[in-house]
Amino acid sequence: MRSHTATMVDRIEDTSRADREAALADAGHNVFELASDDVAVDLLTDSGTGTMSNDQWAAMLQGDEAYAGSASFEDLAVAAEDVMGFQHIIPAHQGRGAENVLYGAVLSAGDTVLNNAHFDTTRAHVAANDATPVDCPVDGARDPDTDAPFKGNFSVERARRVVDDVGADAVPVVVLTITNNSMAGQPVSIENTREVAAFADDIDATFVIDACRFAENAHFVQQREPGYEHDSVAAIAREQLSYADACVMSGKKDGLVNVGGFVGLHDDGRLHEQCRQRGILYEGFSTYGGMSGRDMAAFAVGLREAVEPPYVAERVAQVQRLADALTDRDVPIYQPAGGHAVYIDANAALPHLPREQFPGQAFVCELYREGGVRAVELGRFAFPDTDRRDLVRLALPRRTYGPDHLDHVADTAAAVCERGTDVTGLEIVSEPELTELRHFSAALQPVA
């Protein structure tokens, strides 16, 4: 039984297949351009799309909208320290704002940034600072059929080879993303976190944890890592984050809110002051950072709710339920399932399409055409010039959809797979200059 009830509902508009085909064509076969009213089940992202609790809504009514010295900011700062262990935060309007604040302070042209796997905005921020993003996944991370408990881990061995090549002075930042969104939402172990921290210390680099899904990662540690089975999710999260010098946090994930983020730091030294000044310049004064007081109030409550055992266990179980439903219908997926999403293996589902015709994006379009399901491609289209598989992410908004919605998604995906060779590939018609973010706004068309 779910640990919560619904006190407000949102109507799903009914659309015909003809309606969806017309909408898809108007959108340039890019589902980011679809109107939400034209979508039946929206699994584009879990970022800021979830359902807030009544306690969060109650906190919003008491939000302090003061420009400086907001009591709501103080509530958020206390929650960040209590839950995540960071004594100092620089608020931002969302995670990518926090990335801009932090990476702009620590990167210079010609630098190299090591990460277990850069996600799209992180990769773009690194590139925007004329630095080079390098992924260091462990062996087997890219194999959708390999069964391992922590496929999101960071390969220190691979990272050392990069340092040997470019020099330690060229690597000012080492990033660990938990969970590893680009590698199908796979978790990272505490043991690996310690290893990465020691490696960063060895090369005198700032160790940053991208903590957007820290609570989901802590749940996996509790379930899979020996020695942590009796520890609480809250205690595990605090330990894992304690090894980092800084964190980037998006409240739109494990903050359980619709907007907001921050840079977290353990001390108030030079990096803190640099980030504070950049925050004021780009995000707003250091006690709001682009958030309203009511948003900060809800964020403070959401951080505490994210590590509550019933919530996080139910969250991960719902993702597993969707994975099981897809597997039961012979839809090829990345195994094991992650904590926030299920990833369909489009290369296996549509083997007749060459990678140049974007099988992942083709599958995304067919999901929408077939059943009004919006997903996102995370493969050659989203990450050009990489060797990542063509995956289709089905990201579940938190506390939002029920079993019947998941069954509809699974049935729709199965119907796409059954059509097989009838699915046509795509080609790009136009794309932005910053190709790291092309999947947000590029236009495509079916291959003739």
Swiss-Prot record:
Catalysed reactions, as listed in the record: L-tryptophan + H2O = indole + pyruvate + NH4(+)
> Which EC number(s) are documented for this chain?
4.1.99.1
Question: Where on the chain is N6-(pyridoxal phosphate)lysine found, per UniProt?
Answer: 253
Task: Classify the source by domain of life.
Answer: Archaea
What keywords are assigned to this protein?
Answer: Lyase, Pyridoxal phosphate, Tryptophan catabolism
The record, for InterPro entries, names: ArAA_b-elim_lyase/Thr_aldolase (IPR001597), Beta-eliminating_lyase (IPR011166), PyrdxlP-dep_Trfase (IPR015424), PyrdxlP-dep_Trfase_major (IPR015421), PyrdxlP-dep_Trfase_small (IPR015422), TNase (IPR013440), Tryptophanase_CS (IPR018176)
Query: Which Pfam families does the record match to this protein?
Result: Beta_elim_lyase
Tell me which Gene3D superfamilies the record gives: Aspartate Aminotransferase, domain 1 (3.90.1150.10), Type I PLP-dependent aspartate aminotransferase-like (Major domain) (3.40.640.10)
**Cofactor names:** pyridoxal 5'-phosphate
Protein family (similarity comment): Belongs to the beta-eliminating lyase family.
> What is this protein called in UniProt?
Probable tryptophanase
